[in-house]
Amino acid sequence: YSFTNYDIFHAPEFVGLDNYVKLFTKDREFWNSMAVTLKYTFITVPGKVVLALIIAVILNRNLKGINFIRTVYYIPSLLSGSVAVAILWKVLFMNDGFINSLLGLVHIGPVKWLGTPDMAVITICMLEIWQFGSSMVLFLSALKQVPQSLYEAARIDGASKPRMFFKITLP
């Protein structure tokens, strides 16, 4: 139907590429939505991946109580669609909410988190990045598959921790 002029009252009328010409040349809302989508994508995808990888590397250690901490980091992914989380975000992002109260402690004025289109996109990106738990679990399961003998051999060869991360862990 994209090649037709169509509504529910009349039969479709073939218009060729006219709809696409209008979309790409005259429709400002289309280009605005593309810009917002690109901004959202370029913020959330790297943000979520980097945060999930960092947390997975930290949680890959065999420490006492680490399973509890892993669970705590995964919970936001499970709760993402609940009403309780919606209320929590509302409390956090209100003009006199928790985050603005913390900003006030360091003498930063209140931020209107949803008051402008740019801040709304950033706020929505933060909400998406907050759900990094599923990505973290995937990274953590992959990290658990790396044989410890590779790290032992690298230590014997004198490799530094950053070198082991970039040559063994990350690949």
Model-inferred region functions:
Residues Y1-P171:
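A structural signal for multi-pass alpha-helical bundles of membrane permease subunits
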